[in-house]
């Protein structure tokens, strides 16, 4: 039971049909097993009569239970859904469009409708191209590990577009990349690879002027991207005057 309960939801049912329906599937399995037991064993009729009540509750849950929003604290969401890795919310107001993943407070990515600076850490990270010699280099290559919906990439494209800058992104969650194009005006000029950031560095030889590390799982840094080996790997993919910037 523990093995099935661990691996089937994680690798099969949640990616295929989502969390709500996964709960209903397993509830149905448990209800079926209980019904078989009550009917086949010598249980008093009084207890067996309670079985239709459980079946009725299950049917009502199937009809009404999977349509409710998880984000009961948030009204007027532009988008709400699940991916293999995250529970995703996109919300919009007069000033911005924002993406949140798995958390009540905070945002994962943001797009300012007026095209201004965000007032967040992305603005400070704009110093990295200056440190790598963006105006002196014949060409500038940037890699963003943890692309999200492209907040940092959009800013760099706006402020350094005339400096022959090529921006590449790596994002493990393909659904977030889809949302970036649908809601966050992500540029088609920016190549985004669906892959783990560390695995991507292991697979390529190219070197960059700037490597931005902004990979998070919820509010924690992935363990494989916080080790000495990882930072050595990043260093080996930087040009002579290359700069790494980390959120």
Descriptions of predicted regions:
Residues 104-108, 216-219:
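A short, flexible beta-alpha/helix-coil linker loop
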Residues 9, 70, 77-80, 193, ...:
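Short, functionally important structural connectors and interaction interfaces within domains
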């Amino acid at each position: 039971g523990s093995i099935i309960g661990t691996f089937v939801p994680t690798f099969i049912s949640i990616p295929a049909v989502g969390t709500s329906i996964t709960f209903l599937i397993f509830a149905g399995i448990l209800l079926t097993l209980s019904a078989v037991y009550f009917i086949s064993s010598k249980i008093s009729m009084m207890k067996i009569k309670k079985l239709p009540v459980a079946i009725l509750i299950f049917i009502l849950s199937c009809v009404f239970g999977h349509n409710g929003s998880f984000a009961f604290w948030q009204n007027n969401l532009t988008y709400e859904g699940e991916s293999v890795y995250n529970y995703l919310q996109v919300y919009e107001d007069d000033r911005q469009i924002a993406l949140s993943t798995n958390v009540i407070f905070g945002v994962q990515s943001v797009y300012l409708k007026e095209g201004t600076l965000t007032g967040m850490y992305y603005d400070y990270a704009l110093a990295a191209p200056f440190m790598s010699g963006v105006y002196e280099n014949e060409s500038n290559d940037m890699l963003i590990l943890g692309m999200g919906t492209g907040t940092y990439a959009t800013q760099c494209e706006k402020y350094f577009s005339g400096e022959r800058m090529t921006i590449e992104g790596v994002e493990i969650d393909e659904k977030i990349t889809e949302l970036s194009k649908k809601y966050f005006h992500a540029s088609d000029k920016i190549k985004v690879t669906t892959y783990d950031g560390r695995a991507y560095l292991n697979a390529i030889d190219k070197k960059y002027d700037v490597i931005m590390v902004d990979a998070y799982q919820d509010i924690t840094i992935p363990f494989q991207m916080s080790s000495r080996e990882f930072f050595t790997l990043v260093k080996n993919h930087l040009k002579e005057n290359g700069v790494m910037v980390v959120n």
